[in-house]
Amino acid sequence: MPEAFERYSSNPTYEPPWRKVRFIGIAGPSGSGKTSVAQLIVKALNLPHVVILSLDSFYKSLNAEQKKRAFNNDYDFDSPEAIDWDLLFVKLLELKQGRKVDIPIYSFNEHNRLPETNTLFGASIIILEGIFALYDEKIRSLLDVSVFLDTDSDVCLSRRLNRDINYRGRDIVGVLEQYNKFVKPSYENFVRRQLSYTDLIVPRGRDNKLAIDMVINFIRRTLSIQSETHVKNIDSLQQIVPTIPHLPLNLVQLKITPEISAIRTILINKNTHPDDLQFFLSRIGTMLMNLAGDSLAYEKKTITLHNGNQWEGLQMAKELCGVSVLRSGGTLETALCRQFPTVCLGKILVQINKVTQEPTLHYHKLPRGIATMNVVLMASHLTTHADVLMATQILVDFGVPEENIIIVVYVCYSESIKALAYIFPKVTIVTAFLESVAEPVVGRLDIEKVYYGC
């Protein structure tokens, strides 16, 4: 790598929104409407990066004797001792660091944690709700806003009866016994004490629309500030690009042969039939995947020939995964699967806000164990680099080493390559056509529209 480029790329500055996650804690007595308030907030905002984290997920697993007591409604779930505070703190810290986190699933029917987990990643706002959300000092230290729902006890009891009977498989006698034995004493001894730690006390709980609107407006202001900061962060990368004199050495481009030049002419000709455009895009895609295959790591493998002799050949050193940046990356999936039939696939949906120009993560589905694989990240263009930049950051946050990522695109601008390589200097970029922002040719082609016909 040229010395000047190495110097610039040694200090990456990109900070995705989930690296500055904000926590909102909502506490209150059982049945006060914590879950309902959290759901109202999420529904009002209607954003994929505002999520709810229930304290119920962090109940401790019970041993045989404790389970027996629980099934007899004789186990105190309304005590702070029932919560695994250490695990909760570790998970919140990991979320604060922008990492992928596996959240446990607790079954109230089995009184145990299930082997499955829920994956949480990419959230900008996390609402932690539970009767003891503000109880633990370490947890409170991570919260940006704390809310306490102060609801009439009779209302709380009626809601608890409805929830436990209809959703947790309890009977009315057992619920009332547990309420009188554990819930009421817990409120006086533990839950109510959290009032002294709260920023906002909400009388009448979920029925207090004004207070809920205040919380929603706070979140909107926070997200607006995060959005402005994120866009400025991306813009700052563009300002650095002119100071980088060289393209990275890990840029791999198709050799410009007469065939490639002819295909380029066909692609940019406005009179080319759509069927021909699709055919030649597929042809270029196949060439790109051949080139990407040469960039993978291989290891020796000894096999037995049909005549019984031994032969030492090569095999891929790691399992291969293809990840499409939707929807443009889907145009390269067929070529990838044709070249590597056993490849596993993942999807990332990053959309650019038309008003703020901020990339936003809307969806991701990645194979388990992706951190140990070589990953081919596919997109049609690397022209406005924000979506591919965010997708690459997602892979890194899922534990994929930079050197195991190969970005494959039909066309890219030299400015976008420099910006991307400034942040991820070890990522390999494979492309067919290299252009500049000032003189785009193939870069003007709407590849997704041509490929999908819409």
Swiss-Prot record:
CDD domains: UMPK (cd02023). It catalyses: uridine + ATP = UMP + ADP + H(+); cytidine + ATP = CMP + ADP + H(+). The keyword Transmembrane helix does not apply. GO terms for biological process: CTP salvage; pyrimidine nucleobase metabolic process; pyrimidine-containing compound salvage; UMP salvage. InterPro entries: AAA+_ATPase, P-loop_NTPase, PRibTrfase_dom, PRK/URK, PRTase-like, Uridine_kinase-like. The keyword Nucleus applies. It is found in: Cytoplasm; Nucleus. Its EC number is 2.7.1.48. SUPFAM superfamilies: P-loop containing nucleoside triphosphate hydrolases, PRTase-like. ATP binds at G28, P29, S30, G31, S32, G33, K34, T35. This is Uridine kinase. It comes from Schizosaccharomyces pombe (strain 972 / ATCC 24843) (Fission yeast). The gene is urk1.
